[in-house]
Amino acid sequence: PCAPTGLVLKEFRVTLHCGDYRFDPSLPVYLWVDPGYAGAYAVEVAQVKNDTIYIIDEVYEQGLTTEEVILVCETKEWWSKVIGGAIDIAGRQHQGMPSTEEIWKLKGRIILNSQSISVVDGIDRFRTFLKPDPITGRPHFFTNYNCRGLIAEMGGGVNPIQGLGMWRYKTDRTGAIFSEMPDDKNNHACKAAIYGLVDRFGLAGGRSAKATIQKFY
């Protein structure tokens, strides 16, 4: 079947990228985080094997604080194997109280890295992992079937949070895309994945994200 019109990550296919990819106790765990309250708070739980990413679980909730999300994470079987991760650079903002990044450090005892990433650069990096390897025919990014928020944002299913859907580009009445900047909605899990991919692998083409100026929204 054809991908929905205007889908940002049109390379994603449930039949190619989804499977029974469960927690491997022999590997460390990384948390890739996009904080949110009114939309969604996304925590993508990643393990890396031979430069291939496996999203083994996610916490995808609406209306929870960072402290509450940490409590949810602490109940998971993979929690004791978490060694770090990445978060939206906006997680550094204080606004008169501890930043989101600091709360993860204080309450969860986890250090999450953050850096400025442009929207287009972030999408390009994600696509390099979704595209099948020209030699093996397999991509370098897989997700467990239970990661419904991430799968839905990429166009592979119904979003578990009512009112949220797929991450799309702006299109005109004919369905033609008219901007390389997608809508800043329905992208919480995808942005979390981008923060993690760039933190671990840099930008596509071997560039460093630290040289970019534009924040990812």
Positions of predicted regions on the chain:
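ATPase catalytic-site recognition across NTP-hydrolyzing enzymes
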Residues: 1-35
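Residue-level detector of short, conserved catalytic/binding motifs and their immediate flanks
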Residues: 29, 41, 83, 190
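Short, flexible loop/turn elements at secondary-structure junctions
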Residues: 35-37, 89
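Short, acidic Gly/Pro/Ser/Thr-rich loop/turn segments
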Residues: 38-40, 202
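Short beta-strand scaffold segments in enzyme catalytic cores
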Residues: 40-47
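Mg2+-dependent endonuclease catalytic cores in nucleic-acid-processing enzymes, primarily RNase H-like
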Residues: 47-181, 201-204, 208-217
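Acidic, Mg2+-coordinating catalytic module of metal-dependent nucleases/exonucleases
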Residues: 182-205
